[in-house]
Amino acid sequence: MSQQQQGAEQAPDLNNELQTRREKLSALRDNGNAFPNDFRRDAMSDELHQKYDAMSAEELDAANVEVAIAGRMMTRRIMGKASFATLQDMGGRIQLYVSRDDLPEGVYNEQFKKWDLGDILGGRGRVFKTKTGELSIHCTELRLLTKALRPLPDKFHGLADQETRYRQRYLDLISNENSRNTFKIRSKIMSAIRQFMVNKGFMEVETPMMQTIPGGASARPFITHHNALDIDMYLRIAPELYLKRLVVGGFDRVFEINRNFRNEGVSPRHNPEFTMMELYMAYADYRDLIELTEELFRTLTQDVLGSTIVKYGDEEFDFGKPFEKLTMKEAICKYRPETNMADLDDMDKAVAIAQSIGIKIEKSWGLGRVQCEIFEEVAESHLIQPTFIIEYPAEVSPLARRNDDNPFITDRFEFFIGGREIGNGFSELNDAQDQAERFEEQVRQKEAGDDEAMFFDHDYITALEHGLPPTAGLGIGIDRMVMLFTNSHTIRDVILFPAMRPGK
């Protein structure tokens, strides 16, 4: 049967189901309050399983534990005068045992048996185990709290497609335990990061989401208009310049976890609205941040997943081992062995290498940009195990401090896992004159057609002129981190409501 034929047959069934449920709701309204709000639960399903799964039936009977629980009815088996139903709440699922003789008169036949899957119930009763050993609640009170007018997805062949999971995330969360677990892990990661940062002496702060000058990264911004001020503003592409202003102000260790917005493409690794954690630490350099990054990931994997070994697809990452460190040019030569490292320092030869692997050279690019493009093409996807890439050219690092021994490069690193960038950190540029010159170069690139080049931020230069102490900064993509921790292969699976075209 074709999908079109299936859809044609399903439509009448669904319409009949909707009509039947609306009629039931109408009857509830006629009989009183159809949406009561006076039931209070005192237990969650996961708590009950944790406390009582290990107890025997006899021990539970002796304990005589009574609980009140509420959630969505996911399954039901009616067997004459008694039935079983499965209730789902935020913690998981628990079975209800519903007997006609244990409920007030009329509740079983006139109410419970007429309720539908997807309805939200509240039940009160004694915790016990069935003959098969399943933890259950023997209900002495059972109430309908919310009438669901639409059926559960799996009653009509589940969610239609992957896109529906993202558009109607509520249905995905109702029917997909893996999705629920993904976002529970995400929440644990966020909490663990905050605890780690506080333990390290950092203060959490918030900086503007709307900015008059979008800075802190090379990206195309979203533009909006502030009516009261009558000025165009930009959704931030990064909080970096504001956070460093705070370091100038005397807050030596700050971090922020929040959204960034970049008006760019959508892919399995990119969403225009995404979550970043940025931190800044005075009197430190990029090497200190490399150590901090290793410790952060080691701590998170252990605290959130219970192990420093993370499985992702066919790969296995061991965060308990020291992470690999390579210079950008070492990585190029490692994954393109025919490359002569000295050729990478010659503009003509570097351009020839780039063109030989299909890179289109822009007129505004210097040697540093060419090197970076070669690295991204030949090496980045091979950086599977946790790896730090260091010695990024100054040309592609407009906010990073130049290396003391080689001013062509900066004291910067990027952190890769599974062939994708997870973090970016560097010793901060605190020379106001050097920063102004780099902003001017960015302006020239923007005028030459690079719409991702940075704007000149005069106020930030003024802040630097007041003195930024030696500082190191780090940004980590939270969404990509969650992808790794949950074995998710598209960023849409770890963002509750990813960006999508409006539905028809």
UniProtKB/Swiss-Prot annotation:
InterPro entries: Aa-tRNA-synt_II, aa-tRNA-synth_II, aa-tRNA-synth_II/BPL/LPL, Lys-tRNA-ligase_II, Lys-tRNA-ligase_II_bac/euk, Lys-tRNA-ligase_II_N, Lys-tRNA-synth_II_C, NA-bd_OB-fold
Residues involved in Mg(2+) 1 binding: E414, E421
Compartments where found: Cytoplasm
Annotated gene: lysS
Catalytic activity: tRNA(Lys) + L-lysine + ATP = L-lysyl-tRNA(Lys) + AMP + diphosphate
GO-annotated molecular function: ATP binding; lysine-tRNA ligase activity; magnesium ion binding; tRNA binding
Keyword terms of this UniProt record: Aminoacyl-tRNA synthetase, ATP-binding, Cytoplasm, Ligase, Magnesium, Metal-binding, Nucleotide-binding, Protein biosynthesis
Names of the cofactor(s): Mg(2+)
Region of interest: Disordered: 1-21
Subunit structure, as described in the record: Homodimer.
Protein name per its UniProtKB record: Lysine--tRNA ligase
